Amino acid sequence: MQYLVVSFSHKNTDIVTREKLALSDDNKREDVATTLLQNPVINEAIILSTCNRIEIILSVKDPFSATEAVLKKLSEVSGINYEELEGRADIYEDNGAIHHVFSVASGLDSLVVGETQITGQIKDAYKEAYEKGWCGQKLGRVMHYAFKCSKEVRSSTDITRSPVSVASAAVSMAKEKLGNLGGMSALVVGAGEMGRLAAKHLISHGCNVILVGRDLEKTKTVAQEIDPDIRVEHVSNLQKLINSYRLLFSATSSKNPVITKDMVKEQSFDRYWFDMAVPRDIEEIYVARIHYFAVDDLKEIVNKNMAFREEQARNAYKIVGHHVNEFFKWLQTLEIDPIIKEIRKRAKDSALAELQKAIKKGYIPKEYEKSIEKLLHNAFNRFLHDPTKQLKAIADEPRADTIVEAIKFFFEIEEEVGLNRYKCEYYMNLRS
């Protein structure tokens, strides 16, 4: 039994590619799952498709052939050529696959690290796969451990608490100045990476986001990826918008200011403007009740929280690594059980066969059969107790493979048992 994940996410694909790959339609997912499960090397499948990632999670017999099958099918449904998908895809096998799934479920691989929405999305994907018969015990085990891992990461760390990007720092400062942001409306000018991050952070705090961009179609696509409830406006409406709302976050790639003095009117309410762009998007404006913050004003928050976030991420990845090892340890115990069961069965069958021979030949009276059966049962249980205990004890050790293979050879047991152990060591790739 082997695990495989073929992953496309915000880390290795752009918006356009992810949009083409998206399997948000039920029929599309059904088509992909059905095709993959018809392949003899693929046993089970779970399909996760969100705005920021497409994860094909599989239990397979042959990872290489299964990967080819996945890329071929995704090429067919997306219209993207096979070679491009092959070049972009992140492929994870066995221990790496489990570590990746646990990290994703814990929010450590998200665009906004630590976000909680992904756990619910994975639960929905698992529920669909289970109900439609795409997955069974093998991937079910993975999912249950993934949710257990996610719960511990959230309860044992503060990974979501301290912002380390300019966008998250801007939202954090807005929260500091205004308190609860829930129900407020916020303008986000610019649909690039920084604008997307700001929008995601604002939504996570319960804000109503208005996303403003030059390319209306692109802006609509970005908004749809983040949250379907985001309102989209063209930049031509910017003057009216900036004079109507209290919160503004700007992060365009313009070389010149997009908000100038002549666009601004005095209002009776306080406005908080966060300029996240370099060069600055907002011209120097001295208007009453406008509180202006530039990148340099936000760096203090970012720097203050960076060490804290790194510590929390280290703790989170330790938890993930622990759960990966626990998963394989538990899995290996399950896989050793069939061998132990087979040895006990053979011992019992041999003892009972000899008893029947003895009764048939008259060496043992028939009326003693049940008593002798019980005696033999106790004898071979006592004899096998220590070897069974030792076999379970070494399941987590490197020598387990050799010992189990020797037992299988001597007893001529054909049961497939995969005991390869992996040391779970991953370097952190911290993103804000």
From Swiss-Prot:
Matches recorded under InterPro entries: 4pyrrol_synth_GluRdtase, 4pyrrol_synth_GluRdtase_dimer, 4pyrrol_synth_GluRdtase_N, GluRdtase_CS, GluRdtase_dimer_dom_sf, GluRdtase_N_sf, NAD(P)-bd_dom_sf, Shikm_DH/Glu-tRNA_Rdtase
PROSITE patterns: GLUTR
Main EC class the enzyme belongs to: oxidoreductase
Protein purpose: Catalyzes the NADPH-dependent reduction of glutamyl-tRNA(Glu) to glutamate 1-semialdehyde (GSA).
Record's miscellaneous remark: During catalysis, the active site Cys acts as a nucleophile attacking the alpha-carbonyl group of tRNA-bound glutamate with the formation of a thioester intermediate between enzyme and glutamate, and the concomitant release of tRNA(Glu). The thioester intermediate is finally reduced by direct hydride transfer from NADPH, to form the product GSA.
Stated family: Belongs to the glutamyl-tRNA reductase family.
HAMAP family with a match to the protein in the record: Glu_tRNA_reductase
Record's protein name: Glutamyl-tRNA reductase
Species assigned in the record: Nitratiruptor sp. (strain SB155-2)
Gene: hemA
